[in-house]
From Swiss-Prot:
This is Acetate kinase. GO terms for biological process: acetate metabolic process; acetyl-CoA biosynthetic process. Transmembrane segments: none annotated. It is found in: Cytoplasm. The keyword NAD does not apply. It holds the Pfam family Acetate_kinase. HAMAP family: Acetate_kinase. It comes from the Bacteria. Substrate binds at residue 98. Its EC number is 2.7.2.1. Mg(2+) binds at residues 7, 392.
């Protein structure tokens, strides 16, 4: 079976092709036959496509800013050129999509029907940076005649957080508002779930025995408290804007600020939304960049706003982590993942320093090496700290495999 995975971001498209054989999933993560990444931010009205097969890498400039055309060109590299891995796109058995927001109706991998596609569209106001990109991928696949009848499966970021108890999931607002679907949905669920399971595997312990917090820290960032193997609290909420200070997102702020800006500055909801999601966080405070590496470099050069941005970033990270520890009523395992979480030793050290009173003790040498899928806490630490490399694409492929074996084969017969 060949599964194509599309993982769309607000300004990128990451894709890979897995070949899975037999009646069981492999014990180790297989190397994809093909990987591709489109970056829409590098060139104006163009995209930069990077394709890798069997260790060979090629870069293609897409002479279009049209996402569907770009995805079609990306898929063309599967079957054309010296590094083609398929004779025809018809060899693809299933296409899996990461979808950020699934609302209250989707708790597992779901066959994308017109009704599901419309539901994803209806949730665009709650995930304006992501759900449109997911729809572009779905529509691009549907537009290809050779793939038009191939099952497309949605794997929702929100699904893992369906287990959050009502007191943590609902907001202290009138019930009439709650009845509108206003609640904590949580995001990065595919990553949090994968990293939790991988942590249990690394430690050789049942996941249900761990009081675990997973820290998915990239340009977007969230923490999740996991107890008895399920999510019981998370920092993102109704939208991916709540919680931690992020690269360009503000994270949690006093909602009265928005009313103040509307009343005194005449800002529209759209203007406020854009500012909070794309012009705040590290970028907004520093005035320089949403990239933590740039902030750290500027901080080292004495830039005061970069220094302030970093200190705020760490302060809010610590505060949110304390909140998750309280929800767990303790902590025995802490996991860092994603771009910043896996690579920024300084962030890990500065965050963990505040929790030494819990007996948490990093091993400085291990932490500075940023090893993958490894414990980085000291041997006498009361809290085990790990770096786990998140594998969202493989996690999506696993969910698609389970769907295929539980439902897909019946639908094909």
């Amino acid at each position: 079976m060949k599964f194509l995975i599309l993982n769309a971001g607000s300004s990128s498209q990451k894709s890979c092709l897995y070949e899975l054989t037999g009646d069981r999933l492999p014990e180790t993560i297989p190397e994809p036959l093909w990987e591709a990444f489109i970056d829409w931010t590098v060139l104006a009205n163009q995209g930069r496509l990077t394709v890798e097969t069997a260790g060979q890498k090629q870069v293609i400039i897409l002479e279009t800013g049209d996402r569907q055309q770009g995805i079609a060109r990306m898929l063309d590299t599967l079957v054309t050129g010296d590094d083609a891995v398929l004779k025809s796109l018809a060899e693809i058995d299933l296409v899996g999509h990461r979808v950020v927001h699934g609302g209250t109706d989707h708790a597992e991998a779901t066959l994308i029907t017109p009704e599901v596609q419309q539901a994803i569209a209806d949730l665009i106001p709650l995930a304006p940076a992501h759900n449109p990109a997911h729809l572009e991928g779905i529509e691009a696949i549907s537009a290809l005649l050779v793939l038009g009848e191939v099952p497309q499966i949605a794997v929702f970021d929100t699904a893992f957080h369906r287990t959050i108890p009502t007191p943590a999931a609902e907001y202290p607002i009138p019930q009439a508002w709650t009845n509108l679907g206003i609640r904590r949905y949580g995001f990065h669920g595919t990553s949090h779930k994968y990293c939790a399971q991988k942590t249990a595997e690394i430690l050789g312990k049942p996941l249900a025995d761990l009081k675990l917090i997973t820290c998915h820290i990239g340009n977007g960032a969230s923490l999740t408290a996991i107890k008895n193997g399920v999510s019981i609290d998370t920092t993102m909420g109704f939208t991916p804007l709540e919680g931690l200070m992020m690269g360009a997102r503000s994270g949690s702020i006093d909602p009265a600020i928005l009313l103040f800006l509307q009343e005194t500055q005449g800002l529209t909801p759209a203007e406020i939304n854009t500012t909070l999601n794309k012009k705040s966080g590290l970028l907004g405070v520093s005035g320089l960049s949403a990239d933590l590496r740039t902030i750290l470099q500027a901080k080292a050069e004495g830039n005061e706003q970069a220094q302030l941005a970093y200190v705020m970033y760490i302060h809010r990270f610590r505060s949110c982590l304390g909140q998750m520890i309280a929800s767990l009523e303790g902590l025995d395992t802490l996991v860092f993942t994603a771009g910043v979480g896996e690579n920024a030793a300084t962030v890990r050290a500065d965050v963990c320093q505040a929790f030494e009173f819990l007996g948490l003790k990093l091993d400085p040498e291990l932490n500075n090496r940023s090893p993958r899928d490894t414990v980085i806490s000291h041997s006498d630490s009361l809290v085990t700290v790990l770096i786990v490399h998140t594998e969202e694409d493989w996690a999506i492929a696993q969910d698609c495999w389970h769907w295929w074996h539980s439902q897909g084969q019946r639908k094909q017969s």
